[in-house]
Amino acid sequence: MRTTLRASLFVLVALLLGCAEPKPEFVQAETHLSALRSAGLVPKALGDIEVTAVRRIQSLPTRWVRQGRPFWWAELSCDDGAAGHLAWTDDGRLIDFSLEGLSAVITPQAFALAGVPPIQQFPLKAPDGSAVASGCVPTAGASLVAFWSARPGTASWGGAGEQDLVRRLRGRMRMGVLPDLEGYTDGKMSLAGAFPDELAEALQADADERGVDVDVALSGYDRRLLGAELSAGRPVLVSCVVLLPRKPELSWGHQVVAVGRAEVGGAHYVGVIDNFFTPRIPGSIRWIAEDRIAQLVLVRPRR
């Protein structure tokens, strides 16, 4: 009810000020923003948020993803600069969003853990001297290891630094390297990937070698299982297919760290720390529709 009222007020104010009736896509963006605010997912520190641009995106086919249906993408801003983004389908279904500075939340509709370092992918030198990405799989794994290494009982799982952790896990996996034909990195480096089962094996072997008492397990996506892990203070690695925020016409298979869950308007979302996403405020959570999640990698201390 509040969401509908706020959107209606947005239209009314525009008319009273003598403005043309707002475009439907801007009204839809305001409606989504109101719903997120009601769910406690809009940081008060952002102040007044403005929908500065809305565009219709035609998704592009890639080597991994078929061409999807067009969708809408909105850029948000506040007095301090960028405030986040929203993405939704033609039928109004919210599929992807982020609000700057939201790094933890506890409300009746949402919950998210803080403390997972937002390690970003970085270029490495290939044997032929060219640049290749560190890869989302070991980079996400390193963020999770860094989280646990900052906690009693698992502190010995750390390393000399964040990139050292990435390299260490990467060295335990068979990484596939492919040229960046689609422009994910604007051709700056080749892409690198690995499978979730190899990540699980690498994490278990790395923990065992350092005397870290944890169990690592694979699971298909399960909302209740994910919620239980997060409520117990355990972030979860997830495999997903997501939009590329800096180029939303592109999608790809991705590995990230799940830190949150939310229900907005009857739909369910997973909050993640993304390793190929650079918001204005580092550590801001990105939220994706749960139907984009395929697999979970669980890490559980034994005591």
Predicted regions located by residue number:
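Active-site nucleophile-adjacent alpha helix/oxyanion-hole segment immediately C-terminal to the catalytic cysteine
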Residues: 25, 120-168
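Short hydrophobic alpha-helical membrane-anchoring segments
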Residues: 15-19, 147
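Generic structural marker for isolated residues within well-ordered, non-membrane alpha-helices
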Residues: 10, 141, 200-203
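Positively charged n-region of N-terminal signal peptides that target proteins for export
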Residues: 1-6
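Bacterial N-terminal signal peptides
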Residues: 7-16
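Non-catalytic propeptide/linker segments at domain boundaries
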Residues: 74, 93-115, 119
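Conserved active-site-adjacent core of cysteine acyl-enzyme catalytic domains
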Residues: 20-83, 89-91, 97, 101, ...
